[in-house]
Every structure is written in structure tokens, then in C-alpha cells.
Amino acid sequence: MNTVGVVGMGYVGLTMAVALARKGFTVHGVDASPAVLAALSEGRAHLFEPGVEEGLAAFRGERLHVGRELPPDGVDAVMICVSTPTSPVTHAPELENLRAAARHVAARCGPDTLVIVRSTVPVGASRNVVLPELTGRWGARVRLAFAPERTIQGQALRELEELPQVVGGLDAASRDAAAALFSRVTRRIVPVGSLEAAELVKLVNNCHTDLIYSYGNEVALMAERWGLDPLEVIRAANLDYPRPDLAKPGYVGGGCLSKDPYILMSAARAVGYTPWLVGQARGLNEHLPLRVAERIVALIREARGSAEGARLAVLGWAYKGWPPTDDMRGAPIHVMLPIFRAAGLDLRGHDYLVAPDVIRGLGATPVSAEAAWDGADAVLVITNHPEYAKLDLPARLAVMHRPAVLFDSWRILDEDAARRAGVRYAGIGYG
């Protein structure tokens, strides 16, 4: 097995394509976006992921090819890595991309090709959506597997080699073929008994993460009502206590955690079960950016008497700061912006990886991390990008307009420095 197609050149597919090329496979990447294909053809990654652009430079045109279609003579294996969004209105899974990808694979390949679904899907989608497209062209002889992507953005290439790879198959032969392929990429394979078991692994992993973080946020919101410092409570609760740690409060977004709970809930309801915890956790995490935005506006009004025309600098527009990413899917700022606009705030914005044009397109004036503080009535640090903690905070605070507010979401800045400068300091559930 030497040639592999990767359908979908987003965060999942592009990193997988580079990882495969690094291991000696000849890779044919496919994407429907002309802009994505143009960038990749020039050796430019259209997204930020450490090591990807270097991989493009090393393998493009030799072991890594990109185009709108798979080669006409097929490939040994295909990985389907297309996006599976949920409806912004109903949150129902939208599987048109998955179906179209399967149809393309069926048209360009044959029954000897191993098809591996890597997109996050509802339980049963590989069998009920992908398989019919393949059997419709090939007949009953199909090799189909599901192998979930479980890496974290910012460390994806490393984790592709280090994390155990779960693999389920339509049958044992399909599963074993996929396991053999992935054994050339990663150190450990975890076989499971079906496509559906592998699909559920991905969903429960992500929903568990969402749930863990939501409890830290709940603790913060409760502590705020008692006038307590949630970080003091959480650190004391965790210290040398041999039980699962409480999570630090913070935003929970991204392309996976913002949609996968809805995919799991939809799949569970389809078989007659309504989850108790999954939806509550997601709802709390979605509420948090709204709560913070309203709190920022209230603090500005408290300081100035009115928020109209006040300058707010927002640092960190991606959905997270560590590991760094430029991904804005599920970013807190999307929920916050309508609140800020309604309050009449004058917005400045900075992110170390999100392009200035993107920030400008969302209605803020792009500035440097240092200039963001100049004349600001308030500064909101959304992400925990480590470079923000390295700023000369006393110097930055000195150029803010007075009275001033600093909302440090992740509590990565020096609270004492802010208080010494006469700046109101607050964080999630604090201040």
C-alpha cells in the first residue's frame, strides 16, 4: 500500500497528508476550494499548523500532489477528511460533504481501494452514508474503515505519530488493512469491533473534554456569586488530592468541541436516548462568552458612566491561544461582537496568528499587541497565548485611558501590577 488519497485539505486532511508523505507514501490531496488548491500548489499552507508548510516545501510535487480530483487510475487507499458541520439554526449534522466525498471516491477508485473515514460523523454514518455510495458503484465488495482523528491543533503532526490510533472496520479485513496502514504512521493501534464503535470513540472523547471544562466554568460562575476567587478554590481543591482535577475556567470552542456534542446528541436521539449531560455542558460553555461580554460592558459603564464610544482592545481572536492556532471556528469573539456593537464600543483587535484582514472584516481595527493598549478604556485578553504574558505590562497599563479596565480571561497577567497602576482587574468569575 503506497498511494493514498486524502479528500479534504483542511486542518485534518492537510496534516494527515503531510504526515503520510513524511512516512514515504505518495499522497494525492483533493479539495473543492480553488483558493485552497492555489495556495497549496504554491507551497503555501492556508492554515497554521507547525510543520505543515515545511512538509509542503519538502514533498510538494514529489510525494505530495494536490488537485480537484483523485487520479483517474485510483489509489491504494483513500482517507475522507471533509468537514461535517452542524446547522447554525437546528444544530443537526450536515453530511452533504461526506456524501459528496464518498461519491467522488466511488467514481475515481474501485473495490480494491481501502476507504477510511476520518471526518467526525454521527454514529452509523460510515455505514449509512458512505457505504451506499461505494456499493452503488462497486457492488458488495467494499473495504471500509473508520479511524478517528483525535489530535490537538498546534501539535497535530507530533500527535499523529504519538497518539494511539483507534480503528474500526466494516469487517475484520477492512479493519486490519487500515491498521496496517496506520502502523506506518503511529506506534500503537487500538482495534475496535465495528465502524460504529470507532465513530463513538471520537464523539465521547470530545464531549468528555467539553464536559470537564464546563465544570470548571460552573465553579467560576458560582464562586463569583460568593465573591470568591475561583482559581484559589480550584487550586486548593486539586493540590495533592488523588482524584480527577478540576479544570481552570475558560472558553471552550474550536471546530470540534463546538459541534461534536450536537452530533452525538443527534445520533443518540435517533436511537431513542436523550443525553442528560452533553447538552447542558455545551450550553454552559456557549453561555460563557456571552456572560463575559456583558460583564465587560458593565465594567466599562461602571468606570465611565457610559460604554458608548469607549475603546475596547481585544487580544486573542482565535478560538484558543495554546497550542497556538489561527482557527476561528467556535471562537468566543463571535458571540461577543454583537454585545460590543450594541453597546457602541470602538473595537481594536490583535491576534498573533489571525490575519489583520480577518479582524478588520469582523469590524475591529487591527493593531499590534503593544499598540492595542494605547488610549484603551478597557482591554480584554481572550486567549492564553503565551506571548501576551510576556508583554511589559506596567508600560502597557501606563498608556491606557483612565479609568481603565483589564479583563484577563485566563488570568495569565500580573494582577498586582494592574492594581498598582490603578486599573480595575477582572477575570472569568472574578473581580
Language-model regions: role of each:
Residues 1-431:
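Structural/interface elements that position substrates and couple domains in central-metabolism enzymes
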